[in-house]
Structure formats: structure tokens, C-alpha cells
Amino acid sequence: MRRTGIRLSWRSVDDLALRPKTLDEYIGQERLKQKLRVYLEAAKARKEPLEHLLLFGPPGLGKTTLAHVIAHELGVNLRVTSGPAIEKPGDLAAILANSLEEGDILFIDEIHRLSRQAEEHLYPAMEDFVMDIVIGQGPAARTIRLELPRFTLIGATTRPGLITAPLLSRFGIVEHLEYYTPEELAQGVMRDARLLGVRITEEAALEIGRRSRGTMRVAKRLFRRVRDFAQVAGEEVITRERALEALAALGLDELGLEKRDREILEVLILRFGGGPVGLATLATALSEDPGTLEEVHEPYLIRQGLLKRTPRGRVATELAYRHLGYPPPVGPLLEP
């Protein structure tokens, strides 16, 4: 397809090239980075592998990216896998015995989804760097002990409550990733723009950051879509005005609410008088899966003060009424 009128400069850079390589390049999470610098320097001074590390927090905050940064800072290799991919102990043994060298890092995303059998075989690997494998079946079965290289396990989870106590106790370092500020998200947008050869104003980057739900992954995604609109329009620079037009075209309002988020609040207000209403009833009214409603949409609405979960059900707040342009209920709100 022939393209015309496109004046934005373009540089072919893949996601790996955009990924920061050092803690200094990694934007945000300042308190965590300060502690990590200490842990990394101490491990390098002792010439020992970094202690096993568990990172937890909502999706899209950069847990995988941080694992890559840690590996780069230590000058070691990183092997990436996920809990669901390790179905049986043999899968774990193949990774630990064949893919890792002394000091390397194994990153397991969604570690809370490890099978119980695989998790139990992980315990001695984390503690003593050995793993016992049963060969054969029945009376002829025998156990072989695998000596493993001293490695670091970095686990990542969005649901720390599902991590079993025995597994949690084997992590020497447990850290939480926090949501980003709009200013930090704008910095991430500006960095990606520079690497991609795209010109964008700080004001435009900040508008993207304000609508990114405190999540760097969302900010990067929105920036790419805003870039698309500006590129097709033949703009040389992404200005605040162009960014606002693109974000509006994407269905995002000034709080970062998408169309589905607003529909949830509107149904709650217009059909159920603001609530309280049970999750299952609300999901049925929206033709939505209750799990999607609870895990995908509600957390951000609650963080923004637009929705409350109460013992009697979901309640729209006064702020939700005002944001959507509806008069709030007269008198005290339905639930405190």
C-alpha cells in the first residue's frame, strides 16, 4: 500500500530495543531501585548469585523488564518462562540442568500458577541447588540427584495471596511494584519517542500519561496509537492538541476511562439507582463475565474513587455521578 503525506520520522526499533538495560534507564519505582542497587552491589562484592527475588504487583508495571535489567546489571544470562509452562518436574529439571550456568537468572512469570508437583521440586533447587528426579516406574524406579548451578530465581505474580507459604519463605527478597505517576509515565513515553525517532511535546506525553491507569504498558500502547494518528495526519510533531484528538478517538476520557468502564457506571447509575447491586446481577445486565468485571474493570474504577465494593454490592460514588454528568442522589450516598 502506497503511503503519502507522512512526515513523522520513523525508525524501526523492536520492543527488545526499547527495553531499558540498566536501573538508571528504568523509569519509576525509585524506592525499589534504591534497594536493588544495594542488593546487586552486595552480591557482586561477595561474588555470589543474587538471593531469590519475588516481585509482585498489578500487571503491566514492568516486572519482566526489571528481571532483564537485573540480569544485565549482574552480567549474567536470563532464562524466561512462566508457571503454566512448567507442567511437570521434568520440565523444571530440563530448564535448571540444561539452560542455566553459574549465577544465571531463571525468571518465572505467573509463578503462582506452578503445579504443586513442580513447586515441591523447586524447593530443594532453591535451597540447596539440587533436584531429585525419579527414573522409571514401579519396583525398578530409582532416584537420580541432579547437581544444579548456583542460580537466582526471580518470580513474578499479580496475585501474591496465591503463593504458598513454603514457596514464599524461600525467597530472600520480596518486593512490591507500585503504580506510576503521570509524570513518570510521560517520561516513559518521551524515552520511547526518542528511540523511535518520533517528536512529541512534553505536554502531549503528559496527557498520555494521565490516561494510562498508572501502568507503563498502557502508556506505551497509547503512545503507539497516538503516533499512528499523528503519522497518518502528516504531523511533524505530536502536540498536546493532536494527542487529545487521538485519545478521544480511542474512546478515552480525561480519567483514562474506556467506553466499557463508562458503561459499567452508567448501568449501575441508570438501571440500579447507583446500587448497591451484586456482582453477578451487574455482570448479567452488562452481558459481561463476572471475572472480567471484577479483575479487569473494577480495580481502576475503585482506585479512581468511582466505585465502591460493599457487603451489599457495588455502589457508584458521587464522583461517578459527576464525572458522567448525572446529578448525584439527594441526601447521603447509598453506602458510606
From Swiss-Prot:
Record-linked InterPro entries: AAA+_ATPase, AAA_lid_4, DNA_helicase_Holl-junc_RuvB, P-loop_NTPase, RuvB-like_N, RuvB_C, WH-like_DNA-bd_sf, WH_DNA-bd_sf
Binding residue positions for Mg(2+): 64
Class in the EC hierarchy, top level: hydrolase
Any one of the GO CC terms: cytoplasm
Reaction(s) the record says it catalyses: ATP + H2O = ADP + phosphate + H(+)
Catalytic activity, EC: 3.6.4.-
Region annotated Small ATPAse domain (RuvB-S), chain positions: 181-251
Binding site residues for DNA: 309, 314
Molecular functions per Gene Ontology: ATP binding; ATP hydrolysis activity; four-way junction DNA binding; four-way junction helicase activity
Protein's cellular compartments: Cytoplasm
Any single Pfam family the record assigns to this protein: RuvB_N
Large ATPase domain (RuvB-L) as annotated region, ranges: 1-180
GO biological process: one example: DNA recombination
Keyword annotations from UniProtKB, A to Z: ATP-binding, Cytoplasm, DNA damage, DNA recombination, DNA repair, DNA-binding, Hydrolase, Nucleotide-binding
Listed CDD domains: AAA
Binding annotation for ATP: 18-19, 60, 63-65, 127-129, 170, 180, 217
Chain intervals for the UniProt region annotation (Head domain (RuvB-H)): 254-336
Quaternary assembly: Homohexamer. Forms an RuvA(8)-RuvB(12)-Holliday junction (HJ) complex. HJ DNA is sandwiched between 2 RuvA tetramers; dsDNA enters through RuvA and exits via RuvB. An RuvB hexamer assembles on each DNA strand where it exits the tetramer. Each RuvB hexamer is contacted by two RuvA subunits (via domain III) on 2 adjacent RuvB subunits; this complex drives branch migration. In the full resolvosome a probable DNA-RuvA(4)-RuvB(12)-RuvC(2) complex forms which resolves the HJ.
HAMAP family in alphabetical order: DNA_HJ_migration_RuvB (MF_00016)
Record text about domains: Has 3 domains, the large (RuvB-L) and small ATPase (RuvB-S) domains and the C-terminal head (RuvB-H) domain. The head domain binds DNA, while the ATPase domains jointly bind ATP, ADP or are empty depending on the state of the subunit in the translocation cycle. During a single DNA translocation step the structure of each domain remains the same, but their relative positions change.
Family, per entry: Belongs to the RuvB family.
Function: The RuvA-RuvB-RuvC complex processes Holliday junction (HJ) DNA during genetic recombination and DNA repair, while the RuvA-RuvB complex plays an important role in the rescue of blocked DNA replication forks via replication fork reversal (RFR). RuvA specifically binds to HJ cruciform DNA, conferring on it an open structure. The RuvB hexamer acts as an ATP-dependent pump, pulling dsDNA into and through the RuvAB complex. RuvB forms 2 homohexamers on either side of HJ DNA bound by 1 or 2 RuvA tetramers; 4 subunits per hexamer contact DNA at a time.
Name recorded for this polypeptide: Holliday junction branch migration complex subunit RuvB
Organism: Thermus thermophilus (strain ATCC BAA-163 / DSM 7039 / HB27)
